[in-house]
């Protein structure tokens, strides 16, 4: 079991489907069984999964994350609410890439990778202190000077946990 399909791809496993609301999945020597414990009245998928945690090569809640309509629409809406003049739109990689693309699409301001992310530094929001979070952030992102120097930049960040990267 996994919260997104990329985990299955990594081990060449078959994706069967999502765990339903109110459903229990039992895997034992007899195989896999599904049991509906209760029927929830309303479906409320985790917003963090869709806009923050999920990898772009996954399917969650029945929809591909890549070119996520939700993530791109956030960027489009951001431009509509806060239009500005700039030379480039830069995401804080990787989870805000789609939102930055949406901002770029709506504004017609070119999208550029002006920050390079180290994939050796993990999630920063889980660190227990702000000092540790700040230390990891400095090591996690490096400005791409060839892209950003002398430019007016719209920096798009979707960090909704602590807002530390800004």
Cite the ranges covered by each PLM segment:
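N-terminal segments that mediate ammonia production and transfer
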Residues: 1-96, 104-144
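Hydrophobic, well-ordered secondary-structure elements that form the walls
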Residues: 78, 103, 156-160
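Generic non-transmembrane alpha-helix signal with a bias for helix starts/N-cap capping motifs
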Residues: 96-97, 166
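PRPP/pyrophosphate-binding module of the type I phosphoribosyltransferase fold
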Residues: 136-166
């Amino acid at each position: 079991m996994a919260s997104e399909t990329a985990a299955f791809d990594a081990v060449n496993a078959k994706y069967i489907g999502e765990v339903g609301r109110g459903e229990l999945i039992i895997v034992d020597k007899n195989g896999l069984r599904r049991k509906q414990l209760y029927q929830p009245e309303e479906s409320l998928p985790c917003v963090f999964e869709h806009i923050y945690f999920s990898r772009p090569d996954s399917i969650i809640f029945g929809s591909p994350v890549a070119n996520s309509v939700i993530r791109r629409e956030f960027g489009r809406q951001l431009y509509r609410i806060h239009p500005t003049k700039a030379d480039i739109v830069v995401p804080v990689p990787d989870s805000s890439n789609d939102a930055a693309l949406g901002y770029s699409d709506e504004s017609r301001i070119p999208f550029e990778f002006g920050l390079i992310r180290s994939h050796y530094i993990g999630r920063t929001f889980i660190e227990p202190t702000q000092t540790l979070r700040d230390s990891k952030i400095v090591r996690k992102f490096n400005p791409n000077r060839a892209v950003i120097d002398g430019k007016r930049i719209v920096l798009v960040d979707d960090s909704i946990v602590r807002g530390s990267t800004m």
